[in-house]
Amino acid sequence: MQNNNTAISQLIEAGKWVSQKEWIPATGGNFSARTESGFVITASGQDKGKLTSEQFLQLDLQGKPLAGTKKRSAETQLHLSLYQLIPEAQCVLHTHSVAATVLSQITKSHKLDLTGYEMQKALTGFTSHLETLSIPIFNNDQDIDHLSLLVSDHHLHTPIEHGVLIRGHGLYAVGRNIDEVRRHLEVLEFLFSCELERLKITGIQASNNNK
């Protein structure tokens, strides 16, 4: 388990990378990482491409503040829930890309199924493009406690592996370390972009593929 300073440094670098990819406009999204004392997370309303160490909060795994004076994001609770649900998860990156936002909005099902893409094999646990990747989709909800409960209920019968989509909102990518999360994030964003382009070309509604 890494210390707070190391985790913050890695998240600052991740913020620059994600910002350059244009997956997190304005001050949206939030990043977190597990630490020896709990986890660190970006404060509310921060430009993720220009993060400094003062823009992070340190919390324990019950959500109790340990350090930091800036405003806590309401979405902190969802990060906390993901860490509690997935003990091996060490990092969560929440982004607001166009592809993730639009696909989650037009997909009427509560999951986005993707198959046939070679890049699926870059996700932990996948060995073939013939396998089906299912990313759960949850309706956006300003009541984060309620949203977290829905995510928890889903995880009980269908464990969350690579991330979750929030409808019309964005992606929460998870992994066993920050490098794995960055890989998962990049792969998922690539797949979302491919699927969105495919739907534009074929004219097939996303809901038809995810009944």
Curated annotation (Swiss-Prot):
Sorted UniProt keywords: Amino-acid biosynthesis, Lyase, Metal-binding, Methionine biosynthesis, Zinc
A cellular component term, taken from the record's GO annotations: cytoplasm
Enzyme kind, highest EC tier: lyase
Catalytic activity: 5-(methylsulfanyl)-D-ribulose 1-phosphate = 5-methylsulfanyl-2,3-dioxopentyl phosphate + H2O
InterPro entries according to UniProt: Aldolase_II/adducin_N, Aldolase_II/adducin_N_sf, MethylthioRu-1-P_deHdtase_MtnB
GO molecular function, one term: methylthioribulose 1-phosphate dehydratase activity
Pathway it works in: Amino-acid biosynthesis; L-methionine biosynthesis via salvage pathway; L-methionine from S-methyl-5-thio-alpha-D-ribose 1-phosphate: step 2/6
Cofactor(s), names only, from the UniProt record: Zn(2+)
EC number of this enzyme: 4.2.1.109
Gene3D superfamilies with a match to the protein in the record: Class II aldolase/adducin N-terminal domain
BP-aspect Gene Ontology terms: L-methionine salvage from methylthioadenosine; monosaccharide metabolic process
One Pfam family named in its UniProt record: Aldolase_II
Residues that coordinate or bind Zn(2+): 94, 96
Cofactor comment: Binds 1 zinc ion per subunit.
UniProt-listed SUPFAM superfamilies: AraD/HMP-PK domain-like
KW Amino-acid biosynthesis (keyword) present: yes
Functional note: Catalyzes the dehydration of methylthioribulose-1-phosphate (MTRu-1-P) into 2,3-diketo-5-methylthiopentyl-1-phosphate (DK-MTP-1-P).
Family per record: Belongs to the aldolase class II family. MtnB subfamily.
Record-given protein name: Methylthioribulose-1-phosphate dehydratase
Organism of origin: Pseudoalteromonas translucida (strain TAC 125)
